[in-house]
């Protein structure tokens, strides 16, 4: 997970600390060897970052992410280096957080979106009115 944390810090200026998720034993035994789950902390927010040991398809990533949200009660961020633009757009439409190191981080639970694929990074912070519209 160092790649993700380095990306968030060096490119976007987000100082996030992380360690292995202490409740890892809640993950189904057949899935445990194939997934790395870190508990991350940023400001006062705590969330999970998940990464698969193989290149999983988007439906599998979303299914596993949803089960981790249910198990942990925390926002869970998908980390996948090979997400195509259309896949990232689909995740954004469904408000599923993700990190695509070197390209984009979408963290809606922090009311922020970050892109680093362009020379000047873009940070979008939602105001309460926009947030209410997104909830509909």
Task: Give residue spans per PLM region.
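N-terminal intrinsically disordered, cationic/polar leader segments
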Residues: 116-119
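Charged, structured surface patches that assemble and position nucleic-acid processing machinery
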Residues: 95-107
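DNA-contacting interfaces and partner/effector-binding or oligomerization modules
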Residues: 1-96
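Alpha-helical interaction elements
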Residues: 122-136
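Short, charged, surface-exposed secondary-structure boundary motifs
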Residues: 107-113
């Amino acid at each position: 997970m160092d790649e993700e944390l380095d990306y968030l810090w060096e490119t976007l200026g987000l100082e996030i600390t992380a360690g292995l998720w202490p409740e890892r034993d809640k993950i189904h035994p057949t899935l445990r060897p194939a997934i790395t789950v870190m508990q991350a902390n940023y400001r006062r927010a705590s969330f999970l970052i998940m990464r698969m040991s193989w290149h999983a398809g988007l439906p599998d990533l979303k299914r596993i992410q949803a089960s981790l949200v249910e198990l942990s009660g925390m926002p869970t961020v998908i980390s996948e280096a090979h997400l195509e633009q259309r896949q990232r757009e689909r995740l954004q439409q469904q408000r599923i957080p993700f990190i695509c190191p070197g390209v984009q981080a979408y963290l809606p639970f922090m009311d922020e979106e970050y892109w680093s694929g362009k020379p000047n990074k873009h940070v979008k912070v939602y105001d309460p009115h926009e947030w209410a519209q997104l909830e509909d």
